[in-house]
Regions:
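An interfacial alpha-helical scaffold signature
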Residues: 1-251
Length: 251
């Protein structure tokens, strides 16, 4: 029987596993397609799974169900989320994957215990909008204008990187996260968008939210959005490569 995997958690967080070596149903929790969620014991860990039919379509609703299950488990314990679509072909494949990655999983559980992820979206005006294209009057100038355009593009990119780096440093100093993941890109409306994930102590969520409220009032030139707390999706190292039938890939 194939298993669909949602996340890894600590076995000690689920007293019902103390006397069982086989999968135990989780009460009042269903997964993709309404399937029963099981706690699958594996040494000191518990893998949260549901039975999986390979013919099932893992669609948008399935992705929402995956996130819901991970979120519900996060309320109870430390979790290492699996990537959406992670499937183990059978019991042996699941056990083999956990055994081979046991030390890595245990290390990540220890590092992320009591932690939560907060997500900031910061939007600012692009510091260097593209210049209007100048009409070329002679063929011999085309090459020079092309090289000039390349230099201007490279210069604008460096300026964007500098501005993005300055904003990320400012956010780091304001929120003082334990770890962070940042992406920066330009969007169609001429804005620079930073997606910032901060890892913080779960007990400090309210303080973080208060800091966000005051920061948004201070930084009038930034459009800021906050979401969370979330399971630590961005701070789980990808330990193995993806396969058609996955061998256990935390997201």
């Amino acid at each position: 029987m194939a298993w669909y995997a949602y996340c890894i958690s600590e076995k000690q967080a689920f007293p019902e596993l103390a006397r069982h070596r086989k999968p135990v149903p989780m009460q009042d929790l269903t997964g993709i397609s309404g399937n029963q969620i099981f706690l699958y014991p594996a040494s000191d860990l518990a893998v949260i799974v549901s039975e999986h039919n390979p013919a099932e379509d893992l669609n948008h609703q399935a992705a929402k169900d995956h996130a819901r299950v991970v979120g519900d488990c996060f309320k109870m314990s430390t979790v290492l989320p699996f990537r959406f679509g992670t499937v183990f072909a059978d019991d042996e494949a699941l056990r083999r994957s956990i055994r081979s990655n046991q030390r890595h999983y245990a290390t990540h559980v220890e590092r992320l215990r009591g932690k939560a992820e907060m997500h900031l979206r910061v939007m600012v005006d692009d510091c260097c909008l593209p210049q209007p294209v100048r009409a070329s009057g002679a063929k011999e100038t085309v090459g020079k204008e092309y090289l000039s355009s390349l230099r201007e593009t490279a210069s604008r990119q460096r300026e964007r990187q500098t501005k993005g780096r300055a904003i990320s440093v400012q956010m780091q100093r304001l929120f003082v996260p334990q770890d962070e993941e940042i992406t920066c890109r330009t969007i169609d409306n001429g804005k620079l968008l930073l997606d910032i994930s901060h890892l913080i102590d779960a007990k400090c969520v309210e303080r973080y939210q208060n800091k966000f409220a005051t920061t948004r009032e201070l930084l009038k030139d930034c459009q800021m959005q906050l979401s969370g707390p979330w399971p630590p999706y961005h701070f789980v190292q990808r330990l193995t490569r993806p396969h058609a039938t996955a061998a256990g890939i935390p997201a």
